[in-house]
Amino acid sequence: MNKYFKTSDAKNFAFYKVPKALFEEKYKSVSTDAKMLYGLLLDRMYLSVKNGWIDKQGRVYQYFTIKSAQEKLHFGHEKICKLFFELEVADLIIRKRQGQGKPSIIY
């Protein structure tokens, strides 16, 4: 990546999308790091649709382990757990724990 951005550069980059709604008053208590994690989850949700990961109620779900989030965001285990919790408290995601070392299902 260069220091300066040119008009021709826009098509050469892949971007994560973060909904503008996350920057409104309702979500002011959600940290910027949690919003970034949410952007990663949204990006993966498109892959879940492509893979047909849809439950009986028609809801798209995904698997995104704490370890995977750590690798993407370069945060420790405790920090990632806190970020997932923030998203749950803000009603942005629902995690269904499966137990026995299996990753949670994320809606």
Each language-model region and where it sits:
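Short recognition helix of helix-turn-helix/winged-helix DNA-binding domains
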Residues: M1-I66
